[in-house]
Amino acid sequence: MKFLFDLFPVILFFGVFKWGEGNTEAAQAFGQQYLSGVVSDGLVTASQAPILLATAVAIIATVLQIGYLLVKGRKIDKTLWLSLGIIVVFGGATIYFHNETFIKWKPTVLYWCFAAALLFSQIFLKKNLIRTMMEKQMSLPDGIWHRLNLSWVGFFLTMGLINLYVAYSFSTATWVNFKLFGGMGLMVAFIVAQSLLLSKYMKEPQ
């Protein structure tokens, strides 16, 4: 359930973009009605409407996520606050300047922030964040914890580069597909491969 909750803005982003692609006139009319006041020249074209509407919905969905958690009195992960800040800045720039380049950079910036946090904590704070999150599930030698942390740093750096490659080499529609299916698929594949390699260290349930 948490997995779907975390994916909520991404799924809505994908759904709204696909709707806009298939209903360009309706998307333009909707975008002109609700976004004309926040775009720089007050004009939402048919070609821009799908990505602008999808971006606006993703921003709203992320705000609603945090609002829901606050109302429920639940702890909000720092990663969610970071995601909110990045999508507000880059998504807001996309809408205001009606330029999809900004939102296409959003996943890369988020991935690289994760990588920087893991690396900074390990080098300067002498704290292994991956170990902090996973040590209740497995017992590893210090050297393996170190390499595991670095593997996640490398993964996030690589994901950021792959996102940029797709964003600049293919159409916006292809990038939107990759954002949901490609990015999530690579994440799942990495976690599964890592789990198989570390399975012998998993703690048995008491």
Curated annotation (Swiss-Prot):
GO terms for cellular component: plasma membrane. The chain crosses the membrane at residues 51-71, 79-99, 105-125, 150-170, 178-198. InterPro entries: YciB. Keywords: Cell inner membrane, Cell membrane, Membrane, Transmembrane, Transmembrane helix. Its main location: membrane. It is found in: Cell inner membrane. Pfam families: IspA (PF04279). It is a multi-pass membrane protein. The keyword Oxidoreductase does not apply. Coiled coil: none annotated. Belongs to the YciB family. PANTHER family: INNER MEMBRANE-SPANNING PROTEIN YCIB, INTRACELLULAR SEPTATION PROTEIN A-RELATED. Plays a role in cell envelope biogenesis, maintenance of cell envelope integrity and membrane homeostasis. This is Inner membrane-spanning protein YciB. It comes from Janthinobacterium sp. (strain Marseille) (Minibacterium massiliensis). The lineage of its organism: Bacteria, Pseudomonadati, Pseudomonadota, Betaproteobacteria, Burkholderiales. The gene is yciB.
